[in-house]
Structures are given as structure tokens and as C-alpha cells.
From Swiss-Prot:
Predicted to be exported by the Tat system. The position of the signal peptide cleavage has not been experimentally proven. PROSITE patterns: MULTICOPPER_OXIDASE1, MULTICOPPER_OXIDASE2, TAT. Cu cation 4 binds at H522, C571, H576, M581. Cu cation 3 binds at H144, H527, H570. Belongs to the multicopper oxidase family. CopA subfamily. This is Copper resistance protein A homolog. InterPro entries: Cu-oxidase-like_N (IPR011707), Cu-oxidase_2nd (IPR001117), Cu-oxidase_C (IPR011706), Cu-oxidase_fam (IPR045087), Cu-R_CopA (IPR006376), Cu_oxidase_CS (IPR033138), Cu_oxidase_Cu_BS (IPR002355), Cupredoxin (IPR008972). Keywords: Copper, Metal-binding, Oxidoreductase, Periplasm, Repeat, Signal. It comes from Pseudomonas syringae pv. tomato (strain ATCC BAA-871 / DC3000). The gene is copA.
Length: 589
């Protein structure tokens, strides 16, 4: 049985922390506190987890959160590759709950998705998860029920490898990045449905217009503003939910709490970064230190030395750093630059380094969205296909939605993009990318030409060859679609409640091509099976469980349907998933 670790009795809020100290509103997990060795947590093969309500204070305001074993995040679980683990999850909420083991390969009935894997865990009920651990690395776990993940039901997961890893380190720290809102998540959703840019406090001003006229001229500025107005979109709307309501947390602690990880000078330190947020992409750097990226989504990659990395929602990255004596700031700013999570690596308790300012606010361009050079004056905002002259009659978007192009990989250069018939005159689709590319070498909006070496997907190369080796027998193309004004999200313009399952035959190897027709980024996660990302020429690059899809991108990956059952396939932006960007993948004999 695992040993319970001691917990801090209180976490101070952003404001009025000195006044509130001693109230005992909640407990911070011991693994999230500074310690001289490996992080504490629950380890072994048998675990007891309880999901319930806990009073917390993160921002200076007392709120009721949903927690696992009383903490945010939940306990760090440590498994060992090759073991069989048993996890007894008890529900002390007044609603059904669940736990999904993100990125873990396991039987379908252990995956933890109500309605697909099982019925969920009823109030006062318990579910016993039991499965063999077939992998190693950095992962996480979270509720797959409603908005419970946003309310605090998540935690980190580390699986120790049974064989020596291809790098060394003397110490490790888990760094879990999340977003917290004092608001009820249902209220957040209600606001987004009424006004999709409700939380965008970075809208352009008259002053911005005057500055742009000075730089670009009157004609170019007014034309650009007119195009955005025609699309009923805003180039500053990079995140549906922003720092206007979110506080960004590092290991459950707000920026002013300064989570601290200790080290001895000259040690090699492994940092296990986990983005367990509901809606936030983070750009992570440690001023004064290079990071050697050694793993992505739990699996080893060929080492890449960078200054900064963007971590999509649900992704994980492992890096090695080697700090000298002193203090270093762990700085994770939100992609829209409305806030940051922050911590410190230090050789002595109490030390801290300067916190850098937020980078300038980035703006989306037409090129970002695959719309460069297009005439928006004739744009039909009922989403009439951008290429009306093409014959789409042969597209099959029913039992296997998507265009089937055999084994054709993505093209290296931008291509004129066709679209499925289901997007035609669709009230749930307000935009279509017209010229798409893989964008594997692109650091992403807000990170280009910033003077720092930024990790890109092109840098990610697994330390192993394609584990399957077969060419895909067919290609499934799916479009990520949405309507910004209505805050509606879908695949191919078809929301989950109206969509048929994607049917895969057990054992087949397929290529999935994703096209992002929206102005938002989408991290796409397939449960139960690995996603083997390809380069522009269809060659295997890296094995992942979550694929980041920037606006206007077209990316492909291979999937081996080696897991029977019903599996979730969805955008991991929680509010996008809840609003329809979700499919069932069914693997049958």
C-alpha cells in the first residue's frame, strides 16, 4: 500500500495572504513543496484515491474545489513499468465522476470515459481500475466528467522505466502547469456562449489603429481591419479563456507563492513538465539556463537543446538542466500573454531570481490561419466551400468521416485546401482554411524571431524507428471546425451528438490527416492508441499521445488500431470538447 505523505495545511492566496494564513482552507500536496530529493507521492502497486469537495483559497477568495485526496493537484502517482497496478477510486461528490489516465495504453474498460469506457463512478460509489503498466515516462490523470478537471480533479503520474534511460540526472522535479478560475466553470461556459470573446481584454484600440496607420498606411490598415470585421473575428483572440479570470498555477501554487525546487550546484536536474490546464497553452523558459529536451509525451526523443518550449494542453515534456549556484526562475507565460505561472529552482531555500516581464501581445495574421492572399470580400460566412469548382461528391463523411486519398502524405509546400460537404452552408462553421501546411518548423505565434531558440515539432525525433513499420492502408481526413461567434466546435462541422463513430478494423494501420479550419489552436488526443506523427513527406518522426494543431495547419500521423473497444478522440481544450469537438473511435474485429 502507498504511504500517505504529509501536507501543508494552507496555501496563501494572491491577495490578503498574510490575513488568511492559518485558516486551513486546503492542503498542498507534499510532492509540490520544495524538498532535497525526489518528489514525494504515492508509489507502489495499490492506490486509494478519493474525489470530493475541499475548501480552497488560491486568489484570496475562498472557494469550493473538487479534489483528489484533498489536494490540488492530486497526489503524484509513481508506477513501475511492467507492474500491474490497482487503483480504488471513491466518489464523495454528489455527482458522477471518473478518472482517465492520459496517454496510458490499457484496456478500454479501464480508460475512464463515462459513456464509452464505463458508466462512471456514482456518488458514494467506487470503481477499481486494474491494468498492467506497459510504458514509462511522464503522464497525468484527470476527471473525464463535465467540468471537474477545471475544478481541480487532476494530478501528475510518473512511470519509472524498467531499463536504464539514455540520459543521466541526479535529481528530478515534477512541474505541473494548470489554470484556475474562481468562477464556476459552468458560468464561464455560459459567458462564452453569449459572447465568445468575453475574456479577451486585449482587443485592439483606437491607439493601435493610429499606430498601424503610421506603420502600414491608411489603405493597408483599413483593409486589414475590414477583413477581420467581415469574419467577425479578432486577431487578439488567442485564448477563449484568459488571465481575465484565470490564475496560472505551478504545482497548485499561484505566482506569488513561488513554488520552489531545490538542487545542489552542478547537479543535472530532470524537470517533468506537464500541462494539465483546461484551456491554456504555456510558453516555458528558465532565463539563464538551456534546457535539453529528452522526452515528449512520456517517450524518449533525441536530445534537443532549447531556450524555450511551447507546451500544448495535455502534452508533457521532460528536460534536463544543469544550474550553477544561485536561483533561476521557472517562467511559464500563457500564449496570449495575459498571465504566467512561476516558480524557482534554487540551491538555497529562500532565494529567488528576477521574474521576466511578459512578452508583447501577439496578433494573429491571415497567414497564421491559412488565409494569406485570399480575397475576403467574397467570403461567404455561411461557410460555402472555398473551392466551389471542386467535386466533393466522393467524400465519405459517414461511417468513416474524412477524405480518403490512399496513402498520400501531406505536401511540404502550402496546398489549396478542399473541404468536406458537411461544412457547406453549415451554421456551425464560420471559417475554412484555404492554404494549409504542416508548420512543423514554426515555433508558433508569439515565439517567432524572439531571439531565443524555441522548440518546434520538427525538432522532435523518437529514439526508435516506426514501431509498426507498415504503410497505412488508407487515409482519414478530418477538419477541425468551429463558429467563433456561437462558440460551437466540431469535426467536419458535425458536433459529437450528431456524429457517427469512426470505425477502425482491429490491427489495421491508418493515416489520419487533420486540417485546422479555425483561428484557434487545438490539442487533439486519441485515447488508447499512439499517434505516430509524420513529417511533410510522410516519414515517421515521433510517437505522441497529443497532437498540437495550430490555426491553418495540416498535419498527419499514423495509428495502429491495436486496442479493441470504444475510445474517445477529442480536442483537449475542455470547453471545445464540451461544445462538440469530440468523436468516438470504435475498434472492432
Amino acid at each position: 500500500m502507498p504511504t500517505r505523505t504529509s501536507r501543508r495545511t494552507f496555501v496563501k492566496g494572491l491577495a490578503a495572504s498574510s490575513i488568511l494564513s492559518g485558516l486551513g482552507l486546503w492542503r498542498s500536496p507534499a510532492w509540490a513543496l520544495p524538498n532535497p530529493g525526489q518528489p514525494d507521492g504515492l508509489s507502489g502497486t495499490e492506490f486509494d484515491l478519493t474525489i470530493g469537495e475541499t475548501q480552497v483559497n488560491i486568489t484570496g477568495n475562498a472557494r469550493t474545489a473538487m479534489t483528489i485526496n484533498g489536494g490540488i493537484p492530486g497526489p503524484l502517482l509513481r508506477w513501475r513499468e511492467g507492474d500491474t497496478v490497482t487503483l480504488r477510486v471513491k466518489n464523495r461528490l454528489d455527482e458522477t465522476t471518473s478518472i482517465h489516465w492520459h496517454g496510458i495504453i490499457l484496456p478500454a474498460n479501464m480508460d475512464g470515459v463515462p459513456g464509452l469506457s464505463f458508466d462512471g463512478i456514482a456518488p458514494d460509489g467506487m470503481y477499481v481500475y486494474r491494468f498492467k503498466v506497459r510504458q514509462h515516462g511522464t503522464y497525468w490523470y484527470h476527471s473525464h466528467s463535465g467540468f471537474q478537471e477545471q475544478s481541480g480533479v487532476y494530478g501528475p503520474l510518473v512511470i519509472d522505466a524498467k531499463e536504464p534511460e539514455p540520459f543521466t540526472y541526479e535529481r528530478e522535479h515534477v512541474v505541473m502547469l494548470t489554470d484556475w478560475a474562481d468562477e464556476d466553470p459552468a458560468r464561464v461556459m455560459k459567458k462564452l456562449k453569449k459572447q465568445s470573446d468575453y475574456y479577451n481584454n486585449n482587443k485592439r484600440t483606437v491607439g493601435d489603429f493610429i499606430n498601424d496607420v503610421g506603420e502600414k498606411g491608411w489603405s493597408a490598415t483599413t483593409a486589414e481591419r475590414w477583413m477581420w470585421a467581415q469574419m467577425k473575428m479578432n486577431p487578439t483572440d488567442l485564448a477563449d479563456v484568459s488571465g481575465a479570470t484565470y490564475t496560472y498555477l505551478m504545482n497548485g501554487q499561484a505566482p506569488n507563492m513561488n513554488w520552489t525546487g531545490l538542487f545542489k550546484p552542478g547537479e543535472q536536474i530532470r524537470l517533468r513538465f506537464i500541462n494539465g490546464s483546461s484551456m491554456t497553452y504555456f510558453d516555458v523558459r528558465i532565463p539563464g539556463l538551456k534546457m535539453t529536451v529528452v522526452a515528449s509525451d512520456g517517450l524518449h526523443i533525441k536530445p534537443v537543446v532549447v531556450d524555450e518550449l511551447r507546451i500544448a494542453v495535455a502534452e508533457t515534456f521532460d528536460v534536463i538542466v544543469e544550474p550553477a549556484d544561485g536561483a533561476y526562475t521557472l517562467f511559464a507565460q500563457s500564449m496570449d500573454r495575459t498571465g504566467f505561472a512561476r516558480g524557482t529552482l534554487t540551491s538555497r531555500p529562500g532565494m529567488q531570481a528576477e521574474v521576466p516581464p511578459l512578452d508583447p501581445r501577439p496578433l494573429l495574421s491571415m497567414d497564421d490561419m491559412g488565409m494569406a492572399g485570399m480575397d475576403h470580400g467574397s467570403m461567404n460566412h455561411s461557410a460555402k466551400p472555398a473551392m466551389d469548382g471542386m467535386d466533393h461528391s466522393k467524400m465519405d463523411h459517414d461511417s468513416m468521416p474524412g477524405m480518403d486519398h490512399g496513402t498520400m502524405p501531406m505536401q511540404e509546400a502550402p496546398v489549396m485546401q478542399s473541404h468536406p460537404d458537411s461544412e457547406r452552408n453549415n451554421p456551425l462553421v464560420d471559417m475554412q482554411a484555404m492554404s494549409t501546411s504542416a508548420k512543423l518548423n514554426d515555433p508558433g505565434i508569439g515565439l517567432r524571431d524572439n531571439g531565443r531558440k524555441v522548440l518546434t515539432y520538427a525538432d522532435l525525433r523518437s529514439t526508435f524507428e516506426d514501431p509498426d513499420g507498415r504503410e497505412p492502408s488508407r487515409t482519414i481526413e478530418l477538419h477541425l471546425t468551429g463558429h467563433m461567434e456561437k462558440f460551437a466546435w466540431s469535426f467536419d462541422g458535425v458536433k459529437f451528438s450528431d456524429a457517427k463513430p469512426l470505425m477502425l478494423k482491429y490491427g489495421e494501420r491508418v493515416r489520419i490527416v487533420l486540417v485546422n479550419d479555425t483561428m484557434m489552436t487545438h490539442p487533439i488526443h486519441l485515447h488508447g492508441m499512439w499517434s505516430d506523427l509524420e513529417d511533410e513527406n510522410g516519414q515517421f518522426m515521433v510517437r505522441k499521445h497529443t497532437i498540437d494543431m495550430p490555426p491553418g495547419s495540416r498535419r498527419s500521423y499514423r495509428v495502429t488500431a491495436d486496442a479493441l473497444g470504444r475510445w474517445a478522440y477529442h480536442c483537449h481544450m475542455l470547453y471545445h470538447m464540451e461544445m462538440g469537438m469530440f468523436r468516438e473511435v470504435r475498434v472492432e474485429e
